[in-house]
Design a protein with these regions (language model features):
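Secondary-structure "cap/kink" motif recognition
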Residues: 27, 32-41
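Short, compositionally biased "basic patch" segments
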Residues: 1-30
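PLD/PLD-like phosphodiesterase catalytic module centered on the HKD motif
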Residues: 1, 9-11, 41, 53-180
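Long, repeat-rich segments with strong aromatic
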Residues: 48-49
Length: 180
C-alpha cells in the first residue's frame, strides 16, 4: 500500500489544522521543525519521553537559545533508565512529575504548546518507536508563521492558551518538581 501524503493547508474555522500519521509522515520531524521556530516558550505534558527521540535534542537547543521550556512527565515513565529526564534537567529545563496521593495515577497526555500560538496533540509519545514503527498521530493546530491575519492569530492563541492552562493546572494541582 502506498503511504498517503500529509494533508496540507487545511483550516478549521480560522485555525490551521495539520494531521500527521506515523510512521508514514514522520511526526517527530514536525515537532522539531515547529520547536526550531519557537521564539519564547515551549510547554509540554508527555506520558513517555525517551532520550535521543530527537524531540529532547530540540528542547535542549531551544533552552540553550534562552527559551523557557517547561514540562510535566508521568512519574513512572520519567524514572525509567531510558527516559529523557536527565538530558532535559542537565539543560536546565523545568520538569515536573505527578505526585503520589493526588488521584492522578498517570499523566497520559501527549500535548505541546509553542509560544502560546500553536498546539500539538495526539497519541504520539516522544520516542523513537512512536516515529518509526508505531501507528501514531499528531494534530498540529495553528501556524507560527502566521502574522497577517489578526482574527486567525487570536483564534490559534486562544486555543493554545487553553491547552497551556491545562498543563499549568496539572503542574499546580498534581505536580512536583523533578530536581535531578
Amino acid at each position: 500500500m502506498v503511504p498517503r501524503k500529509p494533508l496540507e493547508d487545511h483550516d478549521v474555522g480560522l485555525v490551521r489544522v495539520k494531521p500527521l500519521f506515523a510512521p508514514d509522515h514522520a511526526p517527530e520531524m514536525e515537532f522539531i521543525k515547529q520547536m526550531i521556530k519557537a521564539k519564547n516558550r515551549i510547554d509540554f505534558a508527555a506520558f513517555t519521553f525517551s532520550q535521543s527521540s530527537g524531540i529532547d535534542d530540540a528542547m535542549v537547543n531551544a533552552r540553550e537559545k534562552g527559551l523557557s521550556v517547561t514540562g510535566l512527565l508521568d512519574r513512572r515513565q520519567a524514572n525509567q533508565s531510558w527516559a529523557a529526564k536527565h538530558t532535559l534537567r542537565t539543560a536546565d529545563i523545568t520538569l515536573h512529575r505527578n505526585r503520589t496521593g493526588t488521584g492522578v495515577r498517570k499523566v497520559h497526555h501527549k500535548l505541546m504548546v509553542i509560544d502560546d500560538r500553536m498546539t500539538i496533540i495526539g497519541s504520539f509519545n516522544y520516542t523513537g518507536p512512536a516515529n518509526l514503527v508505531n501507528d501514531e498521530n499528531i494534530i498540529v493546530l495553528g501556524d507560527l508563521d502566521l502574522h497577517d491575519n489578526p482574527a486567525a492569530e487570536d483564534a490559534q492563541r486562544s486555543l493554545a492558551e487553553y491547552a497551556r492552562a491545562e498543563i499549568d493546572r496539572m503542574i499546580v494541582e498534581a505536580g512536583e518538581p523533578i530536581l535531578t
